[in-house]
Amino acid sequence: MNVNQTMADNQQRCELKLIASPGSWRLYSARKIDERFKSYEQKIFQRDRYTCQFCGFQARLYQDIVNLDGDYTNNRLSNLVTACCFCAQCFFVESVGVGGYGGGTLIYLPELTQAELNSLCHVLFCAITNDTGYKSSAQNIYRSFKFRSQIVEEKFGEGTSDPAIFGQLMIDSGVNSEEIREKLFKNIRLLPSRAKFRKQIEKWAASALEEIAD
């Protein structure tokens, strides 16, 4: 088999999109706490080397498993991939920030793909948390991203930079055409919340410092 082709297929397969769909979150969260899924989950983490298949972030902690086709009844190994918590929440836009799950803001950012933004946020949050020489620059970049939420609200209305509100509006309006969904989400990205992921960020940052010290 052509290795380059396999890699190209994999990259294409793991393109990160924002998705809002009724029912998926319920099945996903039920599976997450199902003890029977734990050993299956470990198989996937090991296969993917604990690496997010969307943004490339590698960590032993707080990685999730998502279904590539968005069907949470299709739990074949080939349909399941490792996703960091920033990328995983993109599959459940309507549930972001609801009941303690995830957190973030919808922003207008045509310059970066969603996966690129998530990857950059891992770097920014680590720089801020570990109080590196780049802390102030990282804070400024993150702040400038957050400011982009105003463009979303100007276009779609007050409150629509809240992913749960935007996602629920999409579900309620019955948008199930891929073409319309892509148009609505065009150039819109989900900016992960530093405050909501504080626990995860602090653990990752501590691990990064340990690796440097080793």
Curated annotation (Swiss-Prot):
- Which residues span the membrane? none
Q: Which domain of life is it from?
A: Bacteria
* Protein purpose: Component of the Dot/Icm type IVB secretion system (T4BSS), which is used to inject bacterial effector proteins into eukaryotic host cells. Part of a subcomplex which recruits effector proteins and delivers them to the core transmembrane subcomplex.
This chain's protein is named Type 4 apparatus protein DotN
Keyword Protein transport attached = yes
Sorted alphabetically, the Gene Ontology cellular component annotations on this record are:
cytoplasm
Q: What is any one GO biological process for this UniProt entry? A: protein transport
Q: Which UniProt keywords apply?
A: Cytoplasm, Metal-binding, Protein transport, Transport, Virulence, Zinc
Q: What are the GO MF terms of this UniProt record?
A: metal ion binding
Classification via InterPro entries? HNH_nuc, T4SS_Dot/Icm_subcomplex
Its predominant location is: cytoplasm
Q: Where in the cell is it found?
A: Cytoplasm
Could you give the subunit structure recorded for this chain?
Answer: The T4BSS is a complex nanomachine composed of several subcomplexes. This subunit is part of the Type IV Coupling Complex (T4CC), a subcomplex composed of the DotLMNYZ core and the IcmSW-LvgA adapter subunits, linked by the C-terminal tail of DotL. Six DotLMNYZ hetero-pentameric units may assemble into a hexameric nanomachine, forming an inner membrane channel for effectors to pass through. Interacts directly with DotL. Interacts with DotZ.
**NCBIfam families reported for this sequence:** IcmJ_DotN_IVB
Statement: the UniProt record of this protein carries the keyword Cell membrane: no
Q: Identify the species of origin.
A: Legionella pneumophila subsp. pneumophila (strain Philadelphia 1 / ATCC 33152 / DSM 7513)
Per UniProt, where does Zn(2+) bind? 52, 55, 84, 87
